[in-house]
C-alpha cells in the first residue's frame, strides 16, 4: 500500500553531498542525469542552490512534500530523506529558511493579477501548484500531528488511555455520527457520491486528466446486497511518476481472486521497497503489463461490483481506471478536521489485527485488501454509533503522543519518528522558529520552547516586525492575511480567465483571395503549433481565417512570422481579437516571456517522434540542456508535434533556438511563454462554454463594480502593493536564504481553489539581485 495521507543561535552542520532525485516530469524525457552528477562534483560550487526543474506529478506539490523540503533544509540528508520533488544542492551552505504565507490568496489570484505580481514572479524561478488547503494549512506544511496543533507540544505521556475517555465523549459531536447518524446504514449510504469523488480526486469520466483512463464497465444497479471487493495496489517510482507494480483483489469471504505483479512501462527509479515490498529481483522476470491487469479486472468484476479501498483514489489512478461505485475506508471512518486514520491503526483497534509489521519487507497487498474489506463489513454490521463509542480520535491521539513520547535529544532519535515535525527537527539541532502572524488569524503554531510567536494587529505591523526579527532566526514563518474571493466573484474570475486564455491563443488572419489554396493555408498555420479549431470568416468582403491554438506560443509565433507577408499578392494581417480581455495582451506576452521561470525555455513546432533521439545525439550543440518536455495526446497517447526544451541559461537556450530553427533542423520556434504548472491548471479547469472570439463582453457585475472602486484592500491593489513589499523584504535577506512564498488557496462549502508556491534561494539567480522592486 502507498504511504497514507495524513533559541536562535545556529549550529554548524557537516558538509553533505547532494544526491540525484528522480525526474517526474509529466511527458518529459529523462533529464541529463550524467550532467547533474558532473556538475555536482565541481569543487567551485559552494553555494546552496536548487535544481532547475521540479519533479512533480501534474505540476502539483503536496503539503507533505513541502514539509519534506523544509525538514531537509534543517537537517540535511544524513538525518532525513531527501525531498522527492526537487533537488537542494549544498544544503549545508544554507543560512536561513523563510516562509511567507499569503492567507486568502490562490493560484487564481496570481494569474488574474499576473502583471501586478511582477516583483514576486520575477524573483522566483520555481513555481508550482498546491492542492486546496485543509482546515489547518500551516500545521500540514510543518508536519504537526493532531495533538500538537491546539496547544503545547507534548513532552511525555505513558500508560493506557484514561478510563474516562469513552465517558467524556459526546457522541453527537463525533464526525461519524454527524455524517451518518446513529442508526445502522446500508451499503448504498456508504458509497462516495460523485461530488465527494470529485473533491477527493478520484478519476472521473470527462475530466481532462482522465481521458486515457479505462472504464470498468460496471454500470449495473446498486443495492445493499451488491458484492464488495477489497482492492489494494503497490507502486514504484519511474521516470514518469508512480506506476503500478502489484494489484490484489479480495472478494467477500476473504478469497483472493487476483494477485498480480506488474512490470511498469517506464524506467524504474525507486522500487519504494519499504512500502511495496517489491525489489528488482522480484520484478525482473515479470511480463504482465498494466493493460493485462486492466483487462483481467474488467472481466472479474460483475456489473454491480463495489470496490473498497483505503485512499482508493491513488489505487484507481495507478490502474488508470474509472469505477463509479466505491467505498473508501479512510473516508468511511470519518476523522476530525479532514484528517484520516491509518489502515494499520484501524486494523488494530477495530479488528484486533496487526498488519504492516515493521519486521516485514514492505506491505502485503493481499492482507491489506482483506483488512480493508473487513473494515467495511464491520461498519455495515455494527453501525456508526458502535464506531463512535470506540472514541477513535482519542485512541489515535494517545497512540501518536506515545509514539512521540520521548522528546528527541539528537538528530539520530529524530530519524526514528517518520512523522517528526519541522519544529522537532529544529529542536534536535538546538534551533528556534519565528512565527509572525496577525492576532485575528485562525492558523497558529503551538507554543513550545523552540517556537517564538509574535502576534501583530495588521499586515503592516507583521511586515515591520519581519524586517527586524527574521535576521535573528534560522527559520521564520511570516503569515499575512487577505480577504478571500467571494463564491460569486470566484466563479466570474474563473470564467474570465478561461475566456482570456482562449482569446489570446486565437488569431485572425487575412484578407485572402477568394481563390486562395485553403489546404496550403491550413498547412501553413498548423506548422506553428497544435490547432484547436480553424474556421473561415465570411462576414468580411474578402475571406479571413480564425485559428484557435492549443498553446499561446503557437499563436504568438504565427503573428510574428506571418503578419505583413504577401499571400497571392495580398498583404495579410495576423492579429488577436480585440476585446477588453486582450487589450493588454502585448504587455502580458512580454511579461510572460520575461518571467524567470521561462528563462532558458524554448518552444518548438514541427518535431518528429524521433526528435528526442536526434537531439541527444548532438550533445555538443545543445550545452546546458536539462529537460525535453514532449506533450502527448491524452486520447491516443501519441506524441504531439511540438515540445519545450529547458536549458540552464538564457544564452544556451538562445543558441539552441538559432540552431534548431536554422536550415539543418528546419523547425519553427521561439522562447517559451507559459510555464508547465500554468498549462496544467488551465487544462484542469472545468469545461465551460465560451463566447466566440471577438464579441464584446459586458463585465460581470460584481467584478465590474469592484474594479470601478479600486480600494486599498482590493485584490488587484493588494497584489501590487504586497508583491512589492515582500519583494523588497526578500531582497534584504542574507545570501543563501531559502525562501518560499505560499498562496495556500481556499476551501469552502462553495468550492475549492488551488494554491500556488514560489521558491528560490537568495542570489541563486541574477534576477534576484538588489533593486528588483526598488
From Swiss-Prot:
<keyword id="KW-0378">Hydrolase</keyword>
<feature type="domain" description="RRM 2">
    <location>
        <begin position="600"/>
        <end position="679"/>
    </location>
</feature>
<dbReference type="InterPro" id="IPR012337">
    <property type="entry name" value="RNaseH-like_sf"/>
</dbReference>
<dbReference type="GO" id="GO:0031125">
    <property type="term" value="P:rRNA 3'-end processing"/>
</dbReference>
<keyword id="KW-0540">Nuclease</keyword>
<dbReference type="GO" id="GO:0005634">
    <property type="term" value="C:nucleus"/>
</dbReference>
<dbReference type="GO" id="GO:0004527">
    <property type="term" value="F:exonuclease activity"/>
</dbReference>
<dbReference type="Pfam" id="PF00076">
    <property type="entry name" value="RRM_1"/>
</dbReference>
<dbReference type="InterPro" id="IPR036397">
    <property type="entry name" value="RNaseH_sf"/>
</dbReference>
<keyword id="KW-0677">Repeat</keyword>
<dbReference type="Pfam" id="PF00929">
    <property type="entry name" value="RNase_T"/>
</dbReference>
<feature type="region of interest" description="Disordered">
    <location>
        <begin position="1"/>
        <end position="22"/>
    </location>
</feature>
<feature type="domain" description="RRM 1">
    <location>
        <begin position="505"/>
        <end position="579"/>
    </location>
</feature>
<protein>
    <recommendedName>
        <fullName>RNA exonuclease 5</fullName>
        <ecNumber>3.1.-.-</ecNumber>
    </recommendedName>
</protein>
<feature type="domain" description="Exonuclease">
    <location>
        <begin position="228"/>
        <end position="376"/>
    </location>
</feature>
<dbReference type="GO" id="GO:0005730">
    <property type="term" value="C:nucleolus"/>
</dbReference>
<dbReference type="InterPro" id="IPR013520">
    <property type="entry name" value="Exonuclease_RNaseT/DNA_pol3"/>
</dbReference>
<keyword id="KW-0269">Exonuclease</keyword>
<dbReference type="GO" id="GO:0070062">
    <property type="term" value="C:extracellular exosome"/>
</dbReference>
<keyword id="KW-0694">RNA-binding</keyword>
<feature type="compositionally biased region" description="Basic and acidic residues">
    <location>
        <begin position="1"/>
        <end position="19"/>
    </location>
</feature>
<dbReference type="InterPro" id="IPR012677">
    <property type="entry name" value="Nucleotide-bd_a/b_plait_sf"/>
</dbReference>
<dbReference type="GO" id="GO:0003723">
    <property type="term" value="F:RNA binding"/>
</dbReference>
<dbReference type="InterPro" id="IPR000504">
    <property type="entry name" value="RRM_dom"/>
</dbReference>
<dbReference type="InterPro" id="IPR034922">
    <property type="entry name" value="REX1-like_exo"/>
</dbReference>
<dbReference type="InterPro" id="IPR035979">
    <property type="entry name" value="RBD_domain_sf"/>
</dbReference>
<dbReference type="InterPro" id="IPR047021">
    <property type="entry name" value="REXO1/3/4-like"/>
</dbReference>
Amino acid at each position: 500500500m502507498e504511504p497514507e495521507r495524513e533559541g536562535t543561535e545556529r549550529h554548524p552542520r557537516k558538509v553533505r553531498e547532494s544526491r540525484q532525485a528522480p525526474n517526474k516530469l509529466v511527458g518529459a524525457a529523462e533529464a541529463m542525469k550524467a550532467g547533474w552528477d558532473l556538475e555536482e562534483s565541481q569543487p567551485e560550487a559552494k553555494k546552496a542552490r536548487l535544481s532547475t526543474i521540479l519533479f512533480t506529478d501534474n505540476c502539483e506539490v503536496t503539503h507533505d512534500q513541502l514539509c519534506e523540503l523544509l525538514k531537509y533544509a534543517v537537517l540535511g540528508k544524513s538525518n532525513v530523506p531527501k525531498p522527492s520533488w526537487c533537488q537542494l544542492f549544498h544544503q549545508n551552505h544554507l543560512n536561513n529558511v523563510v516562509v511567507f504565507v499569503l492567507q486568502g490568496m490562490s493560484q487564481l489570484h496570481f494569474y488574474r493579477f499576473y502583471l501586478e505580481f511582477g516583483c514576486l514572479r520575477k524573483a522566483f524561478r520555481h513555481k508550482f501548484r498546491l492542492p486546496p488547503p485543509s482546515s489547518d494549512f500551516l500545521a500540514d506544511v510543518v508536519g504537526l500531528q493532531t495533538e500538537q496543533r491546539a496547544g503545547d507540544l507534548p513532552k511525555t505521556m505513558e500508560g493506557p488511555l484514561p478510563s474516562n475517555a469513552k465517558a467524556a465523549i459526546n457522541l453527537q459531536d463525533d464526525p461519524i455520527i454527524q455524517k451518518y447518524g446513529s442508526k445502522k446504514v446500508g451499503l448504498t449510504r456508504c458509497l462516495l457520491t460523485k461530488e465527494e469523488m470529485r473533491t477527493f480526486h478520484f478519476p472521473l469520466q470527462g475530466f481532462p486528466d482522465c481521458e486515457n483512463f479505462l472504464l470498468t464497465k460496471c454500470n449495473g444497479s446498486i443495492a445493499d446486497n451488491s458484492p464488495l471487493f477489497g482492492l489494494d495496489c503497490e507502486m514504484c517510482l519511474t521516470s514518469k511518476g508512480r506506476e503500478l507494480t502489484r494489484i490484489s483483489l479480495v472478494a467477500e469471504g476473504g478469497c483472493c481472486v487476483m494477485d498480480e505483479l506488474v512490470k511498469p512501462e517506464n524506467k524504474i527509479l525507486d522500487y519504494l521497497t519499504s512500502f511495496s515490498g517489491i525489489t528488482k529481483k522480484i520484478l525482473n522476470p515479470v511480463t504482465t503489463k498494466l493493460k493485462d491487469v486492466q483487462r483481467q479486472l474488467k472481466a472479474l468484476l460483475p456489473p454491480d461490483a463495489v470496490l473498497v479501498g483505503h485512499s482508493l483514489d491513488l489505487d484507481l489512478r495507478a490502474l488508470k481506471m474509472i469505477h463509479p461505485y466505491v467505498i473508501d475506508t479512510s473516508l468511511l471512518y470519518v476523522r476530525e478536521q479532514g484528517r484520516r486514520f491509518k489502515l494499520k491503526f484501524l486494523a488494530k483497534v477495530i479488528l484486533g489485527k496487526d498488519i504492516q509489521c515493521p519486521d516485514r519487507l514492505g506491505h502485503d497487498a493481499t492482507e491489506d485488501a482483506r483488512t480493508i474489506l473487513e473494515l467495511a463489513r464491520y461498519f455495515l454490521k455494527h453501525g456508526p454509533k458502535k464506531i463512535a463509542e470506540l472514541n477513535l480520535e482519542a485512541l489515535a491521539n494517545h497512540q501518536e503522543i506515545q509514539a512521540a513520547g520521548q522528546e528527541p535529544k539528537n538528530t539520530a532519535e529524530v530519524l526514528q519518528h517518520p512523522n517528526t515535525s519541522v519544529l522537532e527537527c529544529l529542536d534536535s539541532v538546538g534551533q528556534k522558529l519565528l512565527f509572525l502572524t496577525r492576532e485575528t488569524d485562525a492558523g497558529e503554531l503551538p507554543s513550545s520552547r523552540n517556537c517564538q510567536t509574535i502576534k501583530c494587529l495588521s499586515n503592516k505591523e507583521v511586515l515591520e516586525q519581519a524586517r527586524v526579527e527574521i535576521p535573528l532566526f534560522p527559520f521564520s514563518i511570516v503569515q499575512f492575511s487577505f480577504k478571500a474571493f467571494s463564491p460569486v466573484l470566484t466563479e466570474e474570475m474563473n470564467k474570465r480567465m478561461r475566456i482570456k486564455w482562449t482569446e489570446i491563443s486565437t488569431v485572425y488572419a487575412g484578407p485572402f483571395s477568394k481563390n486562395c489554396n485553403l489546404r496550403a493555408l491550413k498547412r501553413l498555420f498548423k506548422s506553428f503549433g497544435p490547432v484547436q479549431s480553424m474556421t473561415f470568416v465570411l462576414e468580411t468582403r474578402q475571406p479571413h481565417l480564425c485559428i484557435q491554438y492549443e498553446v499561446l506560443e503557437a499563436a504568438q509565433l504565427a503573428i510574428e512570422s506571418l503578419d505583413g507577408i504577401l499571400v497571392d499578392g495580398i498583404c495579410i494581417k495576423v492579429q488577436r481579437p480585440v476585446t477588453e480581455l486582450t487589450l493588454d495582451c502585448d504587455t502580458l506576452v512580454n511579461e510572460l516571456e520575461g518571467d524567470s521561470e521561462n528563462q532558458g525555455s524554448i518552444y518548438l513546432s514541427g518535431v518528429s517522434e524521433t526528435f528526442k533521439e536526434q537531439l541527444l545525439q548532438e550533445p555538443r550543440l545543445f550545452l546546458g540542456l536539462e529537460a525535453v518536455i514532449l506533450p502527448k495526446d491524452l486520447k491516443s497517447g501519441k506524441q504531439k508535434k511540438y515540445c519545450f526544451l529547458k536549458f540552464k541559461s538564457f544564452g544556451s537556450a538562445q543558441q539552441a533556438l538559432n540552431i534548431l530553427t536554422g536550415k539543418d533542423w528546419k523547425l519553427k520556434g521561439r522562447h517559451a511563454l507559459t510555464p508547465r504548472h500554468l498549462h496544467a491548471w488551465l487544462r484542469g479547469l472545468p469545461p465551460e462554454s465560451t463566447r466566440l472570439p471577438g464579441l464584446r463582453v459586458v463585465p460581470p457585475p460584481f467584478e465590474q463594480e469592484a474594479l470601478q472602486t479600486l480600494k486599498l484592500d482590493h485584490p488587484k491593489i493588494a497584489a501590487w502593493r504586497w508583491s512589492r513589499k515582500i519583494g523588497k523584504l526578500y531582497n534584504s535577506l542574507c545570501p543563501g536564504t531559502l525562501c518560499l512564498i505560499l498562496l495556500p488557496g481556499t476551501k469552502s462549502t462553495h468550492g475549492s481553489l488551488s494554491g500556488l508556491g514560489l521558491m528560490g534561494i537568495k542570489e541563486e539567480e541574477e534576477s534576484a539581485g538588489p533593486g528588483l522592486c526598488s
